[in-house]
Amino acid sequence: MIGSLKGSVESLGIDNCIIETAGGVGYRVFMPAAQLAQLTQGASVRLHIHTAVREDAIVLYGFLSQEYYDLFELLLTISGVGPKMALGILSAVKPDAFYLAVQSRDIKVLTKLPGIGKKTAERLLLELKDRVGPVAAESGDSFGEAVAAGGSGAVAEA
């Protein structure tokens, strides 16, 4: 399993980038929209990586911060949430705002996230209620402001 990746940003796509390592190998890495927007072509970067192994593909999901990586991993423990849905959530909202929504048990807020209907939101609240500790809102951001700042929410097929 690949746990981290260090190299230069070779190219940028809508929902992914190619990171070329010192050995000359380029890895396609899918990332949350807001974090992908922080990258520039040619820049050096180190990403926290989740490696998803499927029958038909090995897919890398990358994160600039441990906070995003940890929430991605937590979301994958929820029944019915796979890597694409977790990436969609992280493309739409910052981790602190997501945790705040779970703590306040506001199902209406969670259903605004891409791919999250009422049943999935209820499952998120049920399965995360005892696993999410207290979180202070980032500089007083409301959930709506944090969703807007998080990204477009668009996730292309991997």
Residue ranges and their predicted role:
Residues 70-71, 85, 105-109, 154-158:
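A general alpha-helix detector
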Residues 120:
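Conserved Walker
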Residues 1-77:
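Structure-specific DNA junction-binding interface
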Residues 58-63, 83-102, 123-132:
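Amphipathic, charged-and-aliphatic alpha-helical interface segments
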